[in-house]
Amino acid sequence: MTRTSVLADALNAINNAEKTGKRQVLIRPSSKVIIKFLTVMQKHGYIGEFEYIDDHRSGKIVVQLNGRLNKCGVIQPRFNVKINDIERWTDNLLPARQFGYVILTTSAGIMDHEEARRKHVSGKILGFVY
């Protein structure tokens, strides 16, 4: 089976481990986008600590789960999102107002929609977490 998206596989592994009640999950291969996405999730308390293990191939990430995650996913293709359209995307993707985050990749880095609105930057949509 071919991998279509490394980020989608990583978030799917986290979702499945969270549903089965596991305390940690191993993600491989890793990428810079996955690490930045996990950093945003960790900043908002959806996951615990995570550790990057360099095996001189593609690398591994061990993520500690804390049971707060309901769902996380990837939006394909990565649609362009203007600052005015961020509200529309959050209404479509998230279950309620001020519950969860839409993750964007911008020229200022990977961040959630609230930080992007504060910094007044737009970009492409990566995924969501709640």
Swiss-Prot record:
Quaternary structure (record): Component of the small ribosomal subunit (SSU). Mature ribosomes consist of a small (40S) and a large (60S) subunit. The 40S subunit contains about 32 different proteins and 1 molecule of RNA (18S). The 60S subunit contains 45 different proteins and 3 molecules of RNA (25S, 5.8S and 5S).
Chain's gene name: RPS22B
GO MF assignments: structural constituent of ribosome
Keyword Transmembrane helix tagged: no
Pfam families to which the protein is assigned, alphabetical: Ribosomal_S8
Principal location listed in the UniProt entry: cytoplasm
Keywords, in A-Z order: Cytoplasm, Ribonucleoprotein, Ribosomal protein
Function: Component of the ribosome, a large ribonucleoprotein complex responsible for the synthesis of proteins in the cell. The small ribosomal subunit (SSU) binds messenger RNAs (mRNAs) and translates the encoded message by selecting cognate aminoacyl-transfer RNA (tRNA) molecules. The large subunit (LSU) contains the ribosomal catalytic site termed the peptidyl transferase center (PTC), which catalyzes the formation of peptide bonds, thereby polymerizing the amino acids delivered by tRNAs into a polypeptide chain.
Protein family according to the UniProt entry: Belongs to the universal ribosomal protein uS8 family.
Localization terms from the record: Cytoplasm
Taxonomic superkingdom: Eukaryota
Entries under PANTHER family matching the protein: 40S RIBOSOMAL PROTEIN S15A
The protein's name: Small ribosomal subunit protein uS8B
Any single GO CC term annotated in Swiss-Prot or TrEMBL for this entry: cytosolic small ribosomal subunit
TM regions (residue ranges): none
GO biological process, one term: translation
